[in-house]
From Swiss-Prot:
Phosphorylated by CheA. Phosphorylation of the N-terminal regulatory domain activates the methylesterase activity. It comes from Pseudoalteromonas translucida (strain TAC 125). Keywords: Chemotaxis, Cytoplasm, Hydrolase, Phosphoprotein. The active site is at S209, H236, D333. It catalyses: [protein]-L-glutamate 5-O-methyl ester + H2O = L-glutamyl-[protein] + methanol + H(+); L-glutaminyl-[protein] + H2O = L-glutamyl-[protein] + NH4(+). NCBIfam families: PRK00742.1. Belongs to the CheB family. This is Protein-glutamate methylesterase/protein-glutamine glutaminase. SUPFAM superfamilies: CheY-like, Methylesterase CheB, C-terminal domain. The keyword Coiled coil does not apply. Involved in chemotaxis. Part of a chemotaxis signal transduction system that modulates chemotaxis in response to various stimuli. Catalyzes the demethylation of specific methylglutamate residues introduced into the chemoreceptors (methyl-accepting chemotaxis proteins or MCP) by CheR. Also mediates the irreversible deamidation of specific glutamine residues to glutamic acid. One of its GO terms (molecular function) is protein-glutamine glutaminase activity.
Amino acid sequence: MAVKVLVVDDSSFFRRRVSEILELDSEIEVIGFAVNGRDAVEKAASLRPDMITMDVEMPVLDGISAVKEIMASNPTPILMFSSLTRSGATATLDALDAGAMDFLPKKFEDIARNNEDAIKLLQSKVKEIGRQRIRRVASPRPSSINKPLFTPTSAPSALAARFAQTNKTATTVVQPERSFNNSPVTSRSAIVTKRASGKHYQLVAIGTSTGGPVALQTILTQLPANFPHPILLIQHMPAAFTPAFAARLNSLCKIQVKEAQQGDRLQAGVAYLAPGGQQMMIDGRGASRTLRVFEDNSERISYKPSVDVTFASAAKAYQGDVLAIVLTGMGADGREGARMLKQSGATIWAQDEKSCVVYGMPQAIANAGLASESLPLDEVAIRLKTEVGCG
């Protein structure tokens, strides 16, 4: 079944090019256009698309207001297009708060010049987001969260090889585990009454993608100022957006939230957001641990920042004293890094399917048998505070 799309933009050129690009994919069908936010609200009701692409800045009714009205009257997955400016980043975060599912930078040059990577990204986002609507109206698909699918691997992963190359002090490459049957995913009923494990932690690391901004805000705003450990945040997000996102979180949270910088010393009660377009790793030992933030030109690691890269670095720096959490997101970034953490004795949690915007990254963790618990989003902060002893 093709994903039915409503394209919303006040630029006729952008509407036409987005439509042409989407319809290159046989699994996507553009069923209509809207030229402003008011038009979008009306056509969302009349056409009932599976998903909507929408510009943030439009006449008559802006994108943020349109998102609010659509989500109130005809809830539909929405992908926002936003300019790569500080005001554009702030507006995009407002749109996500209003209910939009995800966003892409609005780059006319990529659209005009048929940038292959940009085209594939747009098509994949539209299909993944649109299918969330299709799954809601179709019969529920069975959850595989309690049925781990183990895929034995005899060779080092690309991540492990990359990590060993980047970290000059590494002397061995960790081999992926073949089975984690001793750490099954915990059911929700068990989670509600579960007490702290008593395990010792030094670091919390959280990785996410689609749906992550709202998920992170939900969790971090519930943490106390005296949270006992540093927190590393890896959110797939362009470089122009991470400063605004860190600033927004910092204004809402009791803990300090900042965009990570080269040489930052890791401190308890501070959350460090990986900068867009760069990787974030950990250098040093003990109290002298600092962050290494750098541009990665490797083609072997698709995401910048990458959850895998940071998780792998945490496994080396902290061994088993890490609580890693994988939240909503497309793809499987984080799985190989979580595998290395698991081998070091770390604890891995995954967000459950029902509360995810996109059940991709957490599903990869669960299916690989790496998650000791699968948690609904609204319970993550409660469990986290209990687990680290500040509940």
